[in-house]
């Protein structure tokens, strides 16, 4: 079982769309998937999916409910996945002990092939704890310069906590492949120079007006608009994750 954390240094990168889409795509690759919305302050995976029941993450965090009793099933075409979330804002004051309970539950969820954890944006303590304990971290950035700056800060803090978690980098909302690679290389060059680590560029998602259409309709992009460039890119990224090991860490920081 692999725990994949989806992270971003700032809000507005499309992180939750990526998490929801990868859950959908990996389920269609015959993985048994759990999507955990761990954005404790602003949970919205359920909104993206258009579901009214999103599970009982609060019960898992406070220790009153077992994971298997707290998830809900989301049907996704010929496949489906489980969802563990809570209404937005309900878990804004989640503490360290509750996060440890969640981690324990996820790490023992061996009946899944993959657990996708949609982290909160930024670098607060809960976010970094969850990222450091994941098996792999996918860091979502956009062409916005602030996104790059904050993504570098995220990678720096993560690597200071654990050098075994060199993140993948995924560029969202790129105009084309050239811009996607340019944005990724800017972040990778800084990481090589100052963090002595080489994150792996996982790919890019093109700027696509159908993405916002799917979000407004509260329908998953890959079922609502499966032939769009963004959907095709996300399916390709899922295939890479499905058969590709996490990048190897370098030794130390400076």
Which residues make up each language-model segment?
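G-domain G4 guanine-recognition motif of GTPases
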Residues: 9, 142, 167-182, 204-211
């Amino acid at each position: 079982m692999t725990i994949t954390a989806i992270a971003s240094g700032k809000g507005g990168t499309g992180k939750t769309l990526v998490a929801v889409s990868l859950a959908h795509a990996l389920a269609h690759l015959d993985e048994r998937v759990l999507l955990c919305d761990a954005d404790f302050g602003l949970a919205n995976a359920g909104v993206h999916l258009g579901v009214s029941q999103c599970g009982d993450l609060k019960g898992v965090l406070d220790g009153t409910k077992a994971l298997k009793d707290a998830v809900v099933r989301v049907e996704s075409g010929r496949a489906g996945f489980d969802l563990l979330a809570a209404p937005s804002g309900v878990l804004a004051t989640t503490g360290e002990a509750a996060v440890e309970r969640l981690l324990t539950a996820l790490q023992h969820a061996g009946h899944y092939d993959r657990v996708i954890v949609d982290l909160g944006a930024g670098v607060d303590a809960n976010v970094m704890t969850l990222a450091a304990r994941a098996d792999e971290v996918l860091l979502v950035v956009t062409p916005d310069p602030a996104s790059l700056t904050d993504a570098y800060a995220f990678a720096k803090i993560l690597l200071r906590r654990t050098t075994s978690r060199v993140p993948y980098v995924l560029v969202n909302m790129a105009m084309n492949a050239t811009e996607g690679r340019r944005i990724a290389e800017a972040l990778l060059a800084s990481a090589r120079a100052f963090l002595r680590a080489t994150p792996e560029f996982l790919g890019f998602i093109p700027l696509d007006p159908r993405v916002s259409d799917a979000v407004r309709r509260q329908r998953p992009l890959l079922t609502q608009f499966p032939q769009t460039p963004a959907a095709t890119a996300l399916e390709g990224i899922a295939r890479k994750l499905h058969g590709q090991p996490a990048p190897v860490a370098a030794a130390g920081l400076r």
